[in-house]
Structures are given as structure tokens and as C-alpha cells.
Amino acid sequence: LSKKQFEEYAGVTVENFPEDILSWYDEKGNLRQNWVPGKHAKEWIEWRATVIHDFVEKAHAALKEINPDLIIGDYTGAWYPTYWQLGVNWASKDYDPYQVPEYQAWATEDYHKTGYAEMLDIYMTGLYYSMITKDDVDKATGVVGQRSEAGMDNSLTYCYSVEGGAEIAKEITKGVVPVIGSIYVEQYLGDFTPFGPAVTQALKSTD
């Protein structure tokens, strides 16, 4: 069903599925450590985000018809540079990742149209990071901390800190929705020392 709907959306015929989208196996049938994008990968990424956008749009319209004063909110992780892997574009439609050179590996020219922040009254962003400030990232020396959530990678970039994650969340939502920082309490089991500073930073850096 996904293949058929994607072909209708993109106006293409996927001759080799799923290899033309992505593949986990090499030519000899051996499992790769990381998946490899196929020739239609970027269009597939756009289509997946469109499915979620259209669902949010329909749900928003239906709920507001029942109660115009209803507050509609959403949660996602704050790691936007890799969150496209989950098929979700929680940014403002006016934020265009295609204009960011390092995002052009996955973003199409129309990807920004899948953003749905404008349809939210409140947005909670998951700041599930061991590092709290951007300065912590600079001092990390190869230690990435706990990263067990879907879509995360092991890069030492500012978005993988409470401060940096909040910063990018506010940047890409363009002020169209209040951004509330969310902290994962269980992440601090065994050592609650960073918990207070993490909460303080989240309160400072978000709305």
C-alpha cells in the first residue's frame, strides 16, 4: 500500500522495492551497518512527512470544529537534523531545510511544505540529552552520552544538548507556537546531579 501511494504521490514507478527507496543489504546480500538511500529516497522522505502533515491537518480541523477553544499540542524529539528519519516535520512551513547545505542530503525543495507547527497551540520538544549546555558539547572529547531514542545519531553537535536542542527547536518553529522543553527523568537514574541543571536550562531556553 505504501509503495502504491508513494508512486501516486511522486508520479514515479518504483521498479525495485524497497531498494529504490533504501536498502540494508549489499550486492552479496550481506547486512550493512547503515542503510543506503536509493534513487527515490528524498521523495520518499517528503511523502512520509506529507502523510503526517495531512493527518495533523485533518485532526486539527475536526477537533476545532467540535471545540474552537480546544488546545492542540504535540511532542517530538528535538533532534531535528535527523528526525526526518521518523517521517515527521514539526517545523514551521516557513522554515526551509533545503536552504541548509548539510540538510540537502535528505530535504527536497518542497519538504518545507510538510511542516505543521502552525497547526499547534503548544509544542513540547524532547531535550533528552546528557549534555546540558553547548559548552558541554565543546568539552565532550568524543563522549556522546546516552542516546537511545529513535532517530538519534552519535554526532557531537549542539542540538544534542538541552541548550542547543531548545535553540534549534525555537529557530525552526519560527515563533508560531510556544515551545516547551521536556526532560526525560528516567535518563538521570543512578545520578540525579545533572537533573536540576537540565530542568533549569530547559526553563531558561524555552517558553
Predicted regions, residues:
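Polysaccharide-binding and catalytic clefts of secreted carbohydrate-active enzymes
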Residues: L1-E163, I168
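Proline-centered loop/turn at the N-terminus of a beta-strand
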Residues: D69-I71, V176-I180
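Generic structural signal for hydrophobic
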Residues: G115, A169, Q201-S205
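Conserved beta-strand segments of the P-loop GTPase G domain that flank and frequently precede/overlap
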Residues: G126, S182-Y184
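Charged helix-capping and loop-helix junction motifs
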Residues: S161, P194-P197
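Carbohydrate-binding surfaces of carbohydrate-active enzymes
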Residues: Y184, P197-D207
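Active-site mouth loops of central-metabolism enzymes
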Residues: E186-T193
